[in-house]
Structure formats: structure tokens, C-alpha cells
């Protein structure tokens, strides 16, 4: 939600509501977007987990 707000309105909102049920809105999506901090070493571990999760969702 905050990322979308940044891209659409070019503003940051430090306090936000949780995006409950986002997995339901993602059903039938044609793509996915992975955003992470490449300056952090632990961020590289995110890629494999993201791909595995995306595959699981796609196969349902």
C-alpha cells in the first residue's frame, strides 16, 4: 500500500493500515513485483523465498 502510494502520488505515509486480505486480490494476477533493499546482505535471501511463494500461489 505504501509502495503504491509512493509510485502514484510521490508521497510517503509513515502510518498506514495493514493490507489484510491482499492474497485474495492477487489471485489471477499476471505478474508480481519484488522490491527489496539491495544494500542489505540478508535481502539476497528474499529472492528465492519470493519465487517459491509465487510458484505456490500460481499453482493453486
Curated annotation (Swiss-Prot):
Keywords tagged on the record: Cytoplasmic vesicle, Endoplasmic reticulum, ER-Golgi transport, Golgi apparatus, GTP-binding, Hydrolase, Lipoprotein, Magnesium, Membrane, Metal-binding, Nucleotide-binding, Protein transport, Transport
Gene Ontology BP, a term: autophagosome-lysosome fusion
Span of the signal peptide: none
Coiled coil feature spans: none
Cellular localisation: Endoplasmic reticulum-Golgi intermediate compartment membrane; Melanosome; Endoplasmic reticulum membrane; Golgi apparatus membrane
Protein topology in the membrane: Lipid-anchor
Cofactor list: Mg(2+)
Binding positions for Mg(2+) per the UniProt entry: 1, 19
EC number: 3.6.5.2
Superkingdom per UniProt: Eukaryota
Catalytic activity, as annotated: GTP + H2O = GDP + phosphate + H(+)
A GO CC annotation given for this chain: endoplasmic reticulum membrane
Activity control note: Regulated by guanine nucleotide exchange factors (GEFs) which promote the exchange of bound GDP for free GTP, GTPase activating proteins (GAPs) which increase the GTP hydrolysis activity, and GDP dissociation inhibitors (GDIs) which inhibit the dissociation of the nucleotide from the GTPase.
Short motif (Effector region): ranges: 16-24
MF terms in GO: G protein activity; GTP binding
Modification(s) after translation: Prenylated. Prenylation is required for association with cellular membranes.
Residues involved in GTP binding: 1-2, 19
Function statement: The small GTPases Rab are key regulators of intracellular membrane trafficking, from the formation of transport vesicles to their fusion with membranes. Rabs cycle between active GTP-bound and inactive GDP-bound states. In their active state, drive transport of vesicular carriers from donor organelles to acceptor organelles to regulate the membrane traffic that maintains organelle identity and morphology.
Similarity section: Belongs to the small GTPase superfamily. Rab family.
Subunit structure and binding partners: Interacts with PRKCI. Interacts with TRIP11. Interacts (in GTP-bound form) with GARIN1B. Interacts (GTP-bound) with HOPS complex component VPS39; interaction contributes to obtaining a functional HOPS complex that promotes autophagosome-lysosome membrane fusion driven by STX17-SNAP29-VAMP8. May interact with VPS41.
Name of this chain's protein: Ras-related protein Rab-2A
Lineage: Eukaryota, Metazoa, Chordata, Craniata, Vertebrata
